[in-house]
Each structure stands twice: as C-alpha cells, then as structure tokens.
From Swiss-Prot:
Coiled-coil zones: none
Keywords: 2Fe-2S, 4Fe-4S, Biotin biosynthesis, Iron, Iron-sulfur, Metal-binding, S-adenosyl-L-methionine, Transferase
Family of the protein in this entry: Belongs to the radical SAM superfamily. Biotin synthase family.
InterPro entries linked to this entry: Aldolase_TIM, BATS_dom, Biotin_synth/BioAB, Biotin_synthase, Elp3/MiaA/NifB-like_rSAM, rSAM
Protein species of origin: Helicobacter pylori (strain J99 / ATCC 700824) (Campylobacter pylori J99)
Identification of the protein by name: Biotin synthase
Catalysis: reaction(s): (4R,5S)-dethiobiotin + (sulfur carrier)-SH + 2 reduced [2Fe-2S]-[ferredoxin] + 2 S-adenosyl-L-methionine = (sulfur carrier)-H + biotin + 2 5'-deoxyadenosine + 2 L-methionine + 2 oxidized [2Fe-2S]-[ferredoxin]
PROSITE patterns per the UniProt record, alphabetical: RADICAL_SAM
Binding site for [2Fe-2S] cluster: 61, 96, 154, 221
Biological processes annotated in GO: biotin biosynthetic process
Subunit note: Homodimer.
GO molecular function: 2 iron, 2 sulfur cluster binding; 4 iron, 4 sulfur cluster binding; biotin synthase activity; iron ion binding
Amino acid sequence: MQEIFLCSISNVRSGDCKEDCAYCTQSSHHQGAIKRYKFKDEKVVLQEARALRELGALGFCLVTSGRELDDEKCEYIAKLAKAINKEELGLHLIACCGRADLEQLEFLRDAGIHSYNHNLETSQNFFPKICTTHTWEERFITCENALRAGLGLCSGGIFGLNESWEDRIEMLRALASLSPHTTPINFFIKNPVLPIDAETLSADEALECVLLAKEFLPNARLMVAGGREVVFKDNDKQEAKLFEYGINAVVLGDYLTTKGKAPKKDIEKLLSYGLTMATSCH
C-alpha cells in the first residue's frame, strides 16, 4: 500500500503583512477578515504540536506572516523549535518566514529547525502579475540560501491564478533545479477580498497539474495543500486519483487562514483509499 506523509501547519504570526501578494488574505492591502496577532503563545504552539503528532503528523511547520525574517522572528522561531524538540515528539520542524539570508537560516538550523519552506508560487514570468512588492528572484535566492545552510528545502506553488500551462511548466522546471525534498501543491480558491478573478480549477485540471508536477519532480514528496477541500469537494473517486497521480503527502488540519478538513475524518478517508500513514520522516 502507498504510504502518505502527514504535515501540519501552525500560523504563529498572522496578518498585517505589508506585501501585496494578490492571492493572500494576510496582506494588509486586501483587508481580509482574518485573525491578526503578533506571536502565538509558546504553550499554545506546544499543545498544537502534541495534538497533531498524536494524530499522525510527522511534519510541523511554523509560519510567520511578513516579507522576511528579522532578529525578533529568528529568536522567536528558535525558541519554539527548542521547546518542541525538547518534547521529543519526533516531529520534522519546518520554518516558513519569508525571505531569509544565509546567516539567519544557519541560526535556525542550529536552533533545531530541519527544513525551510519558501514557495516560488508561480513562474518567473507570471510573478509580477500577482506581486509587485518583491521579486520572484528574491524567492529563488532564499531557496538557494536554505540549501546552502544545510536545511531541507520545501518549495512549491499555487495553481489556478490565471497562469498559463507554459507558466506552470516554467515554475516546475525552476523547482526541479532546486531539488526540494517536498513540493506543496496549492489550488487557488476565489475570495471576494482578493484581486485575482479566477474560477476554481476543475478536479480534472487539478489532477493534470499533479501529473505535470510528478513528471518534473519525480523524487520530491508532492504534498497536496490549500484548495483540496474545494476542488475535490466530496468527490472521493477524483480525490483518490491524487494519490494515483503522484501525491504522497497531505497537509493535515487547518491552513494559515482557512479551515482544512477535520483531521480524524480526513485520516479515515485517506485510509479508505487504501493508503497507509507514514510513521517516519525517512
């Protein structure tokens, strides 16, 4: 039976981001109706880590809103990493904190972070259409810095932003050049507060995107993330095809500002597809 890796997310700093990413409700440019807070309490993060690990999650990603890492965020993430690792839960810790230089990433590595997540989101050519406050090249350099720091790299993108198939191929080719160990695959869901006017991808087109990703990234862990609940709805037959077409990792629980599937019910559904849950990160 196919083994599936479960990863979970903790939004440890939410909202008030000064970047203008057109797909993100955390941007202060869009005034999304989301929870906003500076730093989540350490005790709450530890409770989340314990609960999600008990459900079977092996990856735990600490996400901060904002353009980039700074000294305060570095210290905060390092503190969380040390506290979680002290629990000996066996979690693979990922940080997702925006643009970062080599020194910052080495600091996080030494504090106990195992991987860094920084998505390319789309192609270099299409990126200026969805963000003007930073460049695609900055994202790519941060990914390179993570690798140079000796961290694992988690990097992927979003499908359904009105990009072309050529853009999708260009993004996947760039990702392949980085050889990430994990590639999150997100499907954009239309939101009235966001400026992107794009219809939700059909399940068939989403599956084609997965097939394409598998072609370019045969050795990466392909992780279905945001948008799965809407694109596949209650269509179990189509959702099961995700795993036939190359998906071998799933985000368990909620996303940054949107609800995911209820973890226990989601796991029951995955088991009904004949999948098994990985018990080790390796």
